[in-house]
Amino acid sequence: GYGFSSNGGHISTPNVDGPATAMRKALQQAGLNAADVQYINAHATSTPVGDANEAQAIHEVFGETKPYVSSTKSMTGHECWMAGASEIIYSTIMMNEGFIAPNINYETPDEHSAKLNIASKTITKDFDVYLSNSFGFGGTNSAVIVKKYK
């Protein structure tokens, strides 16, 4: 499933509604419920406000289902135009190999990320469905859901 939205309110700060809309559209297109997603690869603007807004959007959509959340961007840095594609590759490798990579350098959760199930160390886990976010400058928001082929 794929979801896209645009909120264009600020050049470097996606709001909460735009990212939440993209994730909901991806779930709808995939024919899945929030509880079906077992891992989220987060990717906001790497700014305190942008990351807090992504955390709020994830919590708004996934609530108490508590999928694991991490950001491979924390290990690679910003890969500019390649980021969304490489994060799909990283997430697919994790799904095929049965682990969730940690969100490195994550030490003190803010009020929004504290509500999420953030992986702060490598977790051994088999999972079949993940969502990968790409929220960027100018309010462009995309979410892709991948389900393991069986």
Where are these regions (language model features)?
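Conserved "HGTGT" condensation-loop signature of ketosynthase/thiolase-family condensing enzymes
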Residues: G1-K150
